[in-house]
């Protein structure tokens, strides 16, 4: 059962407009989704904010998102606010997302953190298809719960999967399962006393492993590391006791990359 009359759907397709910047070619959405028109905070980089006009995801909510980033587009997709997963009772909420990034296109997918409330159960599956010349920044930040209420790891279960393919060949797979019933999530191999977790993947981005490591080490209150994945792409994983240090670290990395790849129009 879905809270809405139908499965919540979002479709977005972009292309290069007459002025050489990324524009929306086609879009479609059902409640609670909405899209803001693109704006251009820096040069030829477009930014589109994804809106969800709802208090958060409930039991039975199912989201189906398909994003097609056209060739040569440079796009940053952000969200409106922190995403809340409410008590799903004996059910769960889910999201299926498919992203295609075209030739010579750049996508920075930068949503706000996800907060699972007490007894929340969430399933997320993301598949990203790239070309050899595509560039990608993709991240998720997961919070231990409503930290201000000291509601830590009281959710039911959280399971997210991320698959990235380049020219139809898999280059990255992440399978995150957080289940407080079966695992002590505060142990030193998991959150180790921290409350916020960042997973950031960088594909074909102009950044060296040593540079990413230096930014992590300079970030106050952040415990993290960076490693190389297939074809020298990078994956950053970090922990903190608040969202701001992780958002700030992510923004520093993204800003450095966009300053390199964007150009004046």
Swiss-Prot record:
Q: Which GO terms describe its cellular component?
A: cytoplasm
Q: List the disulfide bonds.
A: none
Protein's cellular compartments? Cytoplasm
Query: InterPro entries in the record, alphabetically?
Result: UreD
Specify the domain of life of the species encoding this protein. Answer: Bacteria
Q: Which Pfam families match?
A: UreD
Record-level Gene Ontology MF annotations: nickel cation binding
Keyword Cytoplasm listed? The answer is yes
Keywords noted in UniProt: Chaperone, Cytoplasm, Nickel insertion
Q: What is its main location?
A: cytoplasm
Q: What does this protein do?
A: Required for maturation of urease via the functional incorporation of the urease nickel metallocenter.
| Subunit annotation | UreH, UreF and UreG form a complex that acts as a GTP-hydrolysis-dependent molecular chaperone, activating the urease apoprotein by helping to assemble the nickel containing metallocenter of UreC. The UreE protein probably delivers the nickel.
What's this protein's family per the entry?
A: Belongs to the UreD family.
What's the protein called, per UniProt? Urease accessory protein UreH
Q: Which gene encodes it?
A: ureH
